[in-house]
Amino acid sequence: PNPINGAIVEGNKLDIEKYRSFVGYYPMPQRHGLTMGELALLFNKEYGINCKLHVIPMLNWTRDMDFEDTGLPWVIPTPNLPTNATSYVYNATCIFEGTNVSEGRGTTTPFELVGAPWIKSEELSRDLNAYNLPGVFFRPQYYTPTFSKYAGELCGGVYVHITDRKTFEAVKTSWVMLYHIRTKYADNFKINKPYVEGRPSLFEFEAGSDDVIYNQTS
């Protein structure tokens, strides 16, 4: 099943002419709402793979179900997605991987924390909560990563609490957080350089569209 339900679709469509990569390969929205089987059927038919594919349908699953509703144990897909709750907030905070803002790696709650040494926690929490985004609350948080960005340094930031998974708009939350931080802390915020010269940066690959990269004005 889709771990963050199959009922909600959000985000811009990936521009494959400019930003196709291992991050995103086909022109789909960031939060696509599909199951693994549905993705396989889509890729196979619409994008010319045309293999002999057989998908075993799930029993008793409906699109509005959260992973925890299935009663299945959470199997960690990657060390930095330790819980089902993390998979929800990942859609909102993974964009910071390509910036000099910490996305919480090096802590026990990766992707649920966002911060940097030059951010004032209480100030950022107050500002983000003022947007009244549905299903989320930003708690002021100081933390010190043990590895990754700012290892051993005290970071100010926020803990992203999802208060209602049914109304939480992960991608909208992502763009609001990004816009506010890159505007409020313009003297410090930076997009990391590309890993390969002449190629797009990780930030650009994750954003996937010039509409997001260059039109973050409101």
Task: Please give the residue ranges for each predicted region.
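Conserved functional hotspot residues or short segments at active or partner-binding sites
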Residues: 115-218
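Short acidic (Asp/Glu) and glycine-rich catalytic loops that position anionic groups and cofactors
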Residues: 18-22, 103-109, 151-160
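A short, terminal or domain-edge coil/loop segment
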Residues: 52-64, 108-116, 192-204
